[in-house]
Amino acid sequence: MTKDILILAVETSCDETSVSVIKNGRDILSNTVLSQIESHKRFGGVVPEVASRHHVEGITATINEALGDADVSIEDIDAIAVTEGPGLIGALLIGVNAAKALAFAYDKPLIPVHHIAGHIYANHIEEPLTFPLIALIVSGGHTELVYMKDHLSFEVIGETRDDAVGEAYDKVARTIGLNYPGGPQVDRLAAEGEDTYSFPRVWLDKDSYDFSFSGLKSAVINQLHNQRQKNIPIIEANVATSFQNSVVEVLTFKAIQACKEYGVQRLIVAGGVASNKGLRQSLADQCKVNDIQLTIPSPKLCTDNAAMIGVAGHYLYQQGRFADLALNGHSNIDLEEYSAE
């Protein structure tokens, strides 16, 4: 009988302290998430120093809670996986140092995991990954299209040239007057409004899979400023609808085109913006028309969590990709350089 593989995973790349125990690469035995949203809300965004302090305060209790929820001891764990980057360096270091301490104290292998690889592997929890596939990455810091021909094989075929989609959502939300985090609130408003503004769709070069959202963001902000200066009433829901439709149309079109060009029948979506209802519906509609299998994680697995790190860590464990105790956090890591090839 094959022995179960248990991975203890740690995620502290931004403003969630999360620890999870994953069995055999898919089964979530525990997934504890300590959110900092309320602490950052008054600042209108994540403050790195505040995030780091909260990670320090919460990491030990979160580890203990995850082990308790999974009903396992640290001795039962086969390896420790941890997000090494990209992310906020101070936040990353809390998780990395905690993982190194556990690996040293209990003589466990240490597995460094790329944060975006984790988001990709959140899909594996919902439905086993089959290859080749296209992954659409949409988050506060990243907007990418990635071609994968096998596990841990990443070829970035498109990326944002300026703002990430989640960043654009947050800035538009602030301009409208919505509280942090703005993305979910824009999505909610968009369901109530009408597409009354002609905001731009930025396609860039012909056949390019790159993205650009700074022009769209500026167009929305300028429109709102002009209306306020002229005392023209603003229907916030219509602004949200028009903005979101512009974003979703571009993301959907390029994702579907990438699937067609690369001859794949599997599209997965990863990152916090993957929980956006408008995007999920648009992709579902177009994948159905084009006979493409679509997988999007449940909303709780779209945002940062350690379960996704544990799943990616499982496949790194199988490949023997371990780190020594000199492992450090990195604010930027290229996904392709992290690829198994």
Swiss-Prot record:
Which residues hold substrate?
A: 137-141, 170, 183, 187, 276
Q: Which InterPro entries match?
A: ATPase_NBD (IPR043129), Gcp-like_dom (IPR000905), KAE1/TsaD (IPR017861), Peptidase_M22_CS (IPR017860), TsaD (IPR022450)
Q: Which keywords, in A-to-Z order, does the entry hold?
A: Acyltransferase, Cytoplasm, Iron, Metal-binding, Transferase, tRNA processing
Q: How is the cofactor bound?
A: Binds 1 Fe(2+) ion per subunit.
TM spans, by residue? none
The catalytic activity of this protein is classed by the Enzyme Commission as 2.3.1.234
**Residues where Fe cation binds:** 115, 119, 304
| Main enzyme class | transferase
Lineage per the UniProt record:
Bacteria, Bacillati, Bacillota, Bacilli, Bacillales
* HAMAP family per UniProt: TsaD
Q: What does this protein do?
A: Required for the formation of a threonylcarbamoyl group on adenosine at position 37 (t(6)A37) in tRNAs that read codons beginning with adenine. Is involved in the transfer of the threonylcarbamoyl moiety of threonylcarbamoyl-AMP (TC-AMP) to the N6 group of A37, together with TsaE and TsaB. TsaD likely plays a direct catalytic role in this reaction. Critical mediator involved in the modification of cell wall peptidoglycan synthesis and/or cell division as well as in the positive regulation of the activities of different murein hydrolases. Essential for cell viability.
Q: Give the gene symbol.
A: tsaD
Alphabetical list of CDD domains matching this protein:
ASKHA_NBD_TsaD_bac
- Which cofactor is recorded for it? Fe(2+)
A GO CC annotation recorded here is:
cytoplasm
A molecular function GO annotation: iron ion binding
Q: Which GO terms describe its biological process?
A: tRNA threonylcarbamoyladenosine modification
**Pfam families per UniProt:** TsaD
NCBIfam families, per the entry: gcp_kae1, T6A_TsaD_YgjD
UniProt source species? Staphylococcus aureus (strain NCTC 8325 / PS 47)
What is the name of the protein in this document? Answer: tRNA N6-adenosine threonylcarbamoyltransferase
Q: Write out the catalysed reaction.
A: L-threonylcarbamoyladenylate + adenosine(37) in tRNA = N(6)-L-threonylcarbamoyladenosine(37) in tRNA + AMP + H(+)
Q: Which family does it belong to?
A: Belongs to the KAE1 / TsaD family.
According to its UniProt record, where is this protein located? Cytoplasm
